[in-house]
Design a protein with these regions (language model features):
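N-terminal helicase ATP-binding lobe
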Residues: 1-189
């Protein structure tokens, strides 16, 4: 059974949520979480409900939403503009095709930054982006957040810079061994 969710930062179309999605959201809003759901079971609505709530709860902070590929990033950007009730200009999508100085300027007024992990990593290392004022970082396809992958590096940078921020890793495939799953959970925080 699903219910329509009403929130000031969700569009009038509202998102339908099932009980398991609301239970997951409750956990996400209180502690860093690895969300594992099969494809098609509604990870994106959970992510967007978390974005809506964190922007509402901490309007002076940002949310960063990472995706490993530009096509996936574009889909999340489209979904965010459709389902979030925040000024459209405060939702930005940045990738390596945009000059870092322009990205820096765009990020200053953004509430939601959708980006590839390489861009965030490079901008943080360069000093053109700070993660201190980020209340939530979402790592979509979180199974990539291992080893020296840019997703893992950004997660580490975020956990080192953010005092009270939350990390949400979402994936349908956390790993094939207990060790890889435990490593991913430890990496997410």
């Amino acid at each position: 059974m699903s219910a329509r969710i009403s929130h000031p930062n969700l569009s009038s179309e509202n998102i339908e949520a099932r009980a398991y999605q609301l239970k997951a959201l409750k956990n996400i809003l209180h502690s860093s979480t690895l969300l594992v759901l099969p494809t098609g079971m509604g990870k994106t609505p959970i992510e967007l409900m978390a974005v809506a709530d964190k922007i509402y709860e901490s309007p002076h902070k940002k949310v960063i939403f990472l995706a490993p590929t530009n096509p996936l990033l574009a889909q999340h950007y489209k979904d965010a503009k459709k389902f979030l009730n925040i000024p459209e200009e405060s939702i930005i999508m940045i990738n390596g095709g945009i000059n870092w100085e322009k990205r820096q300027k765009m990020a200053q007024s953004a509430k939601l930054i959708l980006a590839t992990p390489q861009v965030i990593r490079n901008d943080v290392i360069r000093g053109s982006l700070s993660l201190v004022d980020c209340s939530l970082m979402i790592i979509d396809e979180a199974h990539h957040a291992s080893g020296k992958h840019a997703m893992a590096q950004v997660a580490d940078l975020y956990l080192n810079q953010s005092n009270d921020g939350l990390l949400l890793g979402a994936t349908a495939s956390p790993g094939s061994t207990d060790k890889s799953i435990i490593n991913l959970i430890n990496r997410i925080g």
